[in-house]
Amino acid sequence: MKLNLITLVVLLIVADLTLLFLPQPLLLPWQVALVIALVLIFLFIFLRRNFLVSLAFFVASLGYFHYSALSLSQQAQNITAQKQVVTFKIQEILHQQDYQTLIATATLENNLQEQRIFLNWKAKEVPQLSEIWQAEISLRSLSARLNFGGFDRQQWYFSKGITAVGTVKSAVKIADVSSLRAEKLQQVKKQTEGLSLQGLLIALAFGERAWLDKTTWSIYQQTNTAHLIAISGLHIGLAMGIGFCLARVVQVFFPTRFIHPYFPLVFGVLFALIYAYLAGFSVPTFRAISALVFVLFIQIMRRHYSPIQFFTLVVGFLLFCDPLMPLSVSFWLSCGAVGCLLLWYRYVPFSLFQWKNRPFSPKVRWIFSLFHLQFGLLLFFTPLQLFLFNGLSLSGFLANFMAVPIYSFLLVPLILFAVFTNGTMFSWQLANKLAEGITGLISVFQGNWLTVSFNLALGLTALCAGIFMLIIWNIYREPEISSSNWQIKRAKFFTLNLSKPLLKNERINVLRCSFGIILLCFTILLFKQLSKPTWQVDTLDVGQGLATLIVKNGKGILYDTGSSWRGGSMAELEILPYLQREGIVLEKLILSHDDNDHAGGASTILKAYPNVELITPSRKNYGENYRTFCTAGRDWHWQGLHFQILSPHNVVTRADNSHSCVILVDDGKNSVLLTGDAEAKNEQIFARTLGKIDVLQVGHHGSKTSTSEYLLSQVRPDVAIISSGRWNPWKFPHYSVMERLHRYKSAVENTAVSGQVRVNFFQDRLEIQQARTKFSPWYARVIGLSKE
């Protein structure tokens, strides 16, 4: 292997990316990495093989990056669930409406270093940035729900450097640590008070989205323009450009001998640094400003690199500065966007296109170049968006085409002017009017969000790769060009300037890579189809609640919906996204009973699927269109499966635990018993006629009032699934239930530990899958379990 800077940086990047998938036991301690690297260097001295140096560098990089993960993981592991008086400083406010969620720094014990804590707080006095408080906090270890393909909150915690979660019980402010940024933020809040889009203006000025209302945020999310609100590369680049232009204007008044080409560059970076400071040097902001400073440094050093090499160096530098950056979705969005544009402009530059063999006029060129840029992002960035967000906005192309120029050249400069001039010349009011206009304009495209399943995402990715193949083949399909000025006419009006054609080998490599992506997508689809079970039962991780999904042939029956609360539900957070990711068509909804932890999301599910049949043991109205009652003796066949209702015997006005709808599902060979929260006295009745079953949904989340000795002696389940929340106040599952299940040699799966549990039924066997296993990445493991 030939040694050069780019090669070493690529090895550095690969070493850091191992943090995305390696489980905790495979992380390499820095001491071990150092020993291995020294041994490899020693071997190099004798063998003189360059690959040994590369390997030593790679191992040393592993030690450096893995140390960050191991250190943070150990801090999180040391947290014990307890109440503690803590003095903390507010670093970031995430949400500030009826309640506050924020990130603070604190020293939890005298012998520990300062840690970052995620806090939930319903404060009487609104907390502000940089304030120091002393509070009684109910601390606990990091934990999160985990469903297949869903959002991993633990990954988000670690990406933010958070090692503990707490709820503030009571607090007293003990100090105001004033900073210029905090003072400026309070000043701007007063200046913009009463403006309709105050939250948006503050977000664009300071990177603080705590005051951004849900309606506005929803508009930008559903139109693929949310990136305009997060201060990142686009905004820092704009600040750099503004500073550069201001410096050029100032240079007009300089004597010629004082005019230097580096002055505008340095001034632009300083201006960008000021904006980054106002934004609190958030992760996206830090990433952007670090990249900018690094590129400027390379320019000053007069080193020449291609755009792709520049990009590689910048990514390596960023990862070296923050090893946990790959855990952040924003990192992949930022790097993905830049990488997509580099590829697009490398192989399909706008300079290719002309009008009747002549360059476009400046105005036309500006408009068409925007179309060209947006189309490139649409083609390259769509696959990344599909896999990260499970969908895309059908009108996002047009929304960005209109919003990006207005934000870039009008709104952001106007907001910066307002910040630095304290709102002179009614600049805040003008910025608010402009923000209202563009928000109203793009809101026309709201509602065009298309949710995409994983399989469809693979198909669309293959389609994008195929379109790119056709573009490359169509543009460069002619024989080698003998004259550098030869123009090839392709249409009546638009022509192509191929004065700089792709080399044949490079063109072939691009086509091969595109075809490889297509082949990979269809291989994954084929593998999924061939390994598809006959039917499956999914117990979703919905915390302290229940949501079980029976799936066959892409159709589903949902048994319970988890809980709900003011402003949200598990149906919105977990169940609907899972159905959409998997492309499952819901046909029936069964509610075991009316308690919130089982039926809280019923209205949300029925709103999303208005044509499903609702089966319930009570007369309670959930706004359904078609309802039947759950009564013992009723049965039906669905997709070749037999459903038999065992309990209750009567319909009631409101169903509680004892009225739970108990259902036996079987395919003639395998059987599943769904018990809801049925109590032991109910089990004495419906278990009389039951024989051995394969899977038991353990009643009442593992409470000692259910899963009686009698039931287990009758059904003797091979697999017992408990749906519970890790921090539930009743400490379910009860030890007596666990003891009984183990005595009957049942394999016990608890969603509080395993996350989502899936049981796949094949013709000759059943197979259990967990969202969280011992092979899960280090950040997804159960943390602090040994201390409970």
From Swiss-Prot:
GO terms for cellular component: plasma membrane. InterPro entries: ComA-like_MBL, ComEC_N, Competence_ComEC/Rec2, Competence_DNA_uptake, DUF4131, Metallo-B-lactamas, RibonucZ/Hydroxyglut_hydro. It holds the Pfam family Competence. Keywords: Cell inner membrane, Cell membrane, Competence, Membrane, Transmembrane, Transmembrane helix, Transport. It comes from the Bacteria. It is a multi-pass membrane protein. It is found in: Cell inner membrane. The chain crosses the membrane at residues 3-23, 27-47, 51-71, 226-246, 263-283, 313-333, 367-387, 401-421, 434-454, 456-476, 508-528. One of its GO terms (biological process) is establishment of competence for transformation. NCBIfam families: ComEC_N-term (TIGR00360), ComEC_Rec2 (TIGR00361). Might contribute to transformation as a member of a membrane-bound pore complex at the base of the transformasome. It could directly interact with transforming DNA during translocation indirectly by participating in the assembly of the pore. This is Recombination protein 2. It comes from Haemophilus influenzae (strain ATCC 51907 / DSM 11121 / KW20 / Rd). The lineage of its organism: Bacteria, Pseudomonadati, Pseudomonadota, Gammaproteobacteria, Pasteurellales.
